[in-house]
């Protein structure tokens, strides 16, 4: 009795089994420079814009840049601390956004506009 060999299908490499050293890791300096640029863009938005909504959006950009810096540092030192700090920053950003939007709605309801300069005229 003659047995025929079983044909095997050759496995093709997937993303999970591909060589991770093809592109190499992103240097920590590049990630921190990107975070600093994003933070500076947010800071310029806070300093230049007088609309309350745009100021809130700029604050969110700044908090995202801080989170990116923690993620980059954590991945550089192979530590989960950066990811944990990012979760804290994300939670803080959500609380800041909800409180900021509540203040924004009340401000718009009372004033009819979102100009921050007129907030100095508010009375207690």
Curated annotation (Swiss-Prot):
Picking any one GO molecular function of the record gives:
quinone binding
Q: Name the domain of life.
A: Bacteria
Catalytic activity, EC: 7.1.1.-
Q: Where in the sequence is the signal peptide annotated?
A: none
Q: How does it sit in the membrane?
A: Multi-pass membrane protein
Query: Where does it mainly reside?
Result: membrane
User: Looking at its record, which EC class is this enzyme?
Assistant: translocase
GO terms, biological process: ATP synthesis coupled electron transport
Key words, A-Z = Cell inner membrane, Cell membrane, Membrane, NAD, Quinone, Translocase, Transmembrane, Transmembrane helix, Transport, Ubiquinone
Record's Pfam families? Oxidored_q2
Transmembrane stretches in the record are 28-48, 52-72, 84-104
Q: Name one GO cellular component term.
A: plasma membrane
Reactions this protein catalyses: a quinone + NADH + 5 H(+)(in) = a quinol + NAD(+) + 4 H(+)(out)
Q: Which InterPro entries match?
A: NADH_UbQ_OxRdtase_chain4L/K (IPR001133), NUOK/Mnh_C1-like (IPR039428)
Which cellular compartments is it found in? Answer: Cell inner membrane
In UniProt terms, what function does this protein have?
Answer: NDH-1 shuttles electrons from NADH, via FMN and iron-sulfur (Fe-S) centers, to quinones in the respiratory chain. The immediate electron acceptor for the enzyme in this species is believed to be ubiquinone. Couples the redox reaction to proton translocation (for every two electrons transferred, four hydrogen ions are translocated across the cytoplasmic membrane), and thus conserves the redox energy in a proton gradient.
Q: Tell me the subunit arrangement.
A: NDH-1 is composed of 14 different subunits. Subunits NuoA, H, J, K, L, M, N constitute the membrane sector of the complex.
Q: Which family does it belong to?
A: Belongs to the complex I subunit 4L family.
Q: Which PANTHER family match?
A: NADH-UBIQUINONE OXIDOREDUCTASE CHAIN 4L (PTHR11434:SF16), NADH-UBIQUINONE OXIDOREDUCTASE SUBUNIT ND4L (PTHR11434)
Q: Which NCBIfam families match?
A: PRK05715.1-1, PRK05715.1-2
User: What is the designated name of this protein?
Assistant: NADH-quinone oxidoreductase subunit K
Q: Give the source species.
A: Psychrobacter sp. (strain PRwf-1)
* Record lineage: Bacteria, Pseudomonadati, Pseudomonadota, Gammaproteobacteria, Moraxellales
């Amino acid at each position: 009795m003659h047995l025929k060999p079983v044909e095997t299908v050759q496995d093709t490499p997937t993303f999970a089994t591909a060589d991770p050293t093809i592109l190499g890791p992103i240097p920590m300096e590049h990630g921190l420079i990107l975070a600093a640029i994003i933070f500076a863009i947010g800071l310029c938005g806070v300093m230049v814009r007088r609309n309350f909504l745009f100021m809130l959006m700029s604050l969110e950009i700044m908090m995202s840049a801080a989170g990116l810096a923690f993620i980059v540092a954590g991945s550089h030192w192979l530590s989960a601390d950066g990811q944990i700090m990012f979760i804290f920053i994300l939670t803080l950003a959500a609380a800041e956004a909800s409180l900021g939007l509540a203040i924004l709605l009340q401000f718009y309801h009372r004033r009819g506009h979102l100009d921050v300069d007129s907030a100095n005229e508010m009375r207690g």
